[in-house]
Regions:
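Conserved phosphate/anionic-ligand binding catalytic regions in large, soluble enzymes, centered on
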Residues: 40-60, 144-147, 238-250, 306, ...
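Short glycine-rich or small-residue beta-strand-to-loop segments that form or flank ligand, phosphate
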Residues: 86-92, 233-236, 411, 539
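Gly/Ser/Thr-enriched, mixed-charge loops and adjacent short helices
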Residues: 11-15, 19, 35-44, 152-285, ...
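Active-site phosphate-binding/coordination module
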Residues: 126-184, 306, 317, 406
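Phosphate-binding and adjacent anionic-ligand microenvironments
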Residues: 294, 298-300, 320, 340-526, ...
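N-terminal small/polar loop signature for handling phosphorylated ligands or for N-terminal nucleophile
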Residues: 88-151, 253-313
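An N-terminal, well-structured beta->alpha segment
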Residues: 3-104, 111, 193-194, 199-230, ...
Length: 564
């Protein structure tokens, strides 16, 4: 790659966007070496998750030039793979989303690829739905999921509505590498592309069919009379993202109408002013909702992230509100689905549930209890989507009952191939109604599962390594763990080291290392695929909560030192 200063000068000479040009000129005038290096030391990597980065000027930023270059590469791939390709496009509430959508659609149109565009902000699951419903060759969603406000991203999908395969990502990445951001991108005027029918708006009927599919996949055995006898009261926050209309629409049609929306987080706002990190995994993002719960006393709090593919839940637990973890909600939902289906007389031994290698071991206990086949895949919901697609290809998609990952992504149904907070919000409410009729809330239900199967506790630690130096340090840490793995962790002997860069259980190779400790506890280390972070997943089982938490804390302390 060229010298960062040469790249800066090239961008100053070629950039037409006034905002980006001003940022570039400021970098040069101030001589801020750290800023220049971080903006230009690498190209944003295009992988199975597409692109993701902070918004701004440079090759390592999300802007119309990096988005345009990626789109040209995607268009080249589509034209080489499909005859008369079409692409569905959506965006969440993030800043620059509309600009990136129009830039992308105009480039696709100039390359002979028909672009079908949602006219308003739309959740990730509705994009996956549109790809399948409209029989598109692919899809693109402008989103950075639950990253902080300075981020945006470019999520690419295949014709099955699942995030693109590794093979497709490699082919697109190669095409991108051969494209000059300033001279190699074909484009045309967006409005002209609309007039010529090369860009078309996705109408409301597509979204209506999505709602119908979600409602058809609800899971409840309760009668209307039973539901009316225990009406659910809900506080909901879309965290200034895309979830408000689809989530409340689906809940209302399912008869769940007592919904109070957090007013400060109701409207779309890419600055996320009330929660700089709009991630329903963390209490800070949920705090406005919890404060409102203290006033209206609902049965539960639901929060969807900006692109409404993840959902978090909080329930009253003593004097405070408990945030259920992704693993806890995953096992609660899976247990509820199994109970409900078994009560209908379904043979669960013919069913398949899917989770990841970093999800709770309690799922294995559920599989033993109910008899379903459990499949574990690599981290990333695309791998769960791939398994659903493979079942569909063999005419066995009805076997799939549930998939989840520990990072608050869930799917019960084959209508889409990505995590779906809209349909999961309905499922969570149906489950809450089931337990409410028994005089319980979801905290009570989770306590019963712990008492029955054991206290499987989990914790995820994220350590940040920003900038060019951080990327090198992350690579060095992972290399060091492979070359000189520790003999013990938290005073426990490491009985096995599993390197997923070699073929493990038929899974694709991945930059993941697992340390299996004596006593059945373990730690898993993997770099994030979307942020400059290394994640440490800790797993512990105890006779009670205190014992499990003590083990978690001990492993965390040792793990932080190991990754420092």
């Amino acid at each position: 790659m060229a010298d960062v200063h040469e790249l800066l000068d090239t961008w100053i000479a070629n950039v037409k966007d006034e905002e980006l040009l001003a940022e570039l000129n400021t970098m040069k005038e101030q001589g801020d070496e750290d800023a220049i290096t971080d903006a230009f030391f690498q190209d944003l990597a295009f992988g199975t998750a597409g692109l993701r980065g902070t918004i701004g000027a440079g090759t390592n930023r999300m802007n119309i030039y990096t988005v345009g270059r990626a789109t040209q590469g995607f268009a080249d791939y589509l034209n080489a793979t499909f005859e008369h390709p079409t692409v569905a496009i959506a965006r969440d509430s993030r800043n620059k989303g509309e600009l990136f959508v129009k830039t992308t659609a105009a480039i696709l149109a100039a390359n002979g690829v028909t672009a079908l565009v949602y006219p308003k902000i739309s959740p990730v699951p509705t994009l996956s739905w549109a790809v399948r419903d409209l029989k598109c060759s692919g899809g693109i969603c402008m989103t950075a999921s639950h990253n902080p406000a300075p981020y945006n991203g470019y999520k690419a999908y295949g014709p099955d509505g699942c995030q693109i395969t590794s093979e497709a990502a490699d082919a697109i990445s190669k095409a991108i590498a051969e494209t000059d951001a300033f001279t190699g991108v074909k484009s045309m005027d967006f409005d002209e592309a609309v007039e010529q029918g090369l860009v078309k708006w996705i109408d409301d009927s597509c979204l209506e069919r999505y709602y119908e599919a979600v409602l058809a996949r609800g899971v409840t055995n309760l009668s209307a009379e039973e539901i009316a006898g225990a009406p659910l009261k809900l506080v909901y926050t879309p965290l200034n993202g895309t979830g408000l209309i689809p989530v409340t629409t689906v809940l209302e049609r399912a008869g769940i109408t007592d919904v109070t929306v957090v007013p400060e987080q109701k409207e779309p706002n890419g600055d996320f002013p009330t929660c700089p990190y709009p991630n329903p995994e963390i209490r800070q993002a949920m705090q406005k909702g919890i404060d409102l719960c203290e006033q209206v006393h609902p049965d539960l709090l639901l929060a969807t992230d900006p692109d409404a593919d993840r959902v978090g839940v909080a329930v009253k637990n003593g004097d405070d509100y408990l945030l259920l973890t992704g693993n806890e909600m995953g096992v609660l939902l899976l247990d509820y689905i199994c109970k409900t289906r078994a009560a209908r007389g379904e043979d669960l031994t013919k069913k398949v549930a899917v989770t990841t290698i970093v999800s709770s071991a309690m799922v294995d206990a559920l599989a033993e209890e109910y008899g379903f086949e459990l499949r574990r895949c690599l981290t990333g919901f695309k791998y769960i989507g791939d398994i659903i697609t493979s079942l569909s290809d063999t005419g066995e998609v009805d076997r799939f009952i549930f998939g989840f990952e520990e990072s608050y992504g869930y799917l019960a149904g084959d209508h889409v191939r990505d995590k779906d907070a809209v349909s999961t919000s309905l499922l969570i409410c149906q489950m809450a109604q089931y337990y409410k009729l028994q005089g319980k809330n979801l905290a009570d239900a989770m306590h019963e599962l712990y008492e029955k199967y054991g206290y499987y506790h989990n914790k995820t630690i994220s350590l940040s390594y920003p900038g060019a130096e951080g990327a090198a340090k992350m690579a060095g840490i992972m290399a060091g763990l492979r070359e000189n793995p520790p003999a013990e962790l938290a005073g426990s002997k490491i009985e096995a080291v599993v390197d997923y860069n070699t073929c493990v259980n038929g899974l694709p190779k991945a930059n993941v290392i697992e340390f299996d400790l004596e006593g059945g506890n373990k730690g898993i280390v993997r770099p994030s695929g979307t942020e400059p972070k290394i994640k440490l997943y800790i797993f512990a089982k105890g006779a009670d909560a205190a014992e499990a938490d003590a083990v978690l804390d001990s492993i965390e302390e040792s793990g932080r030192k190991l990754l420092a």
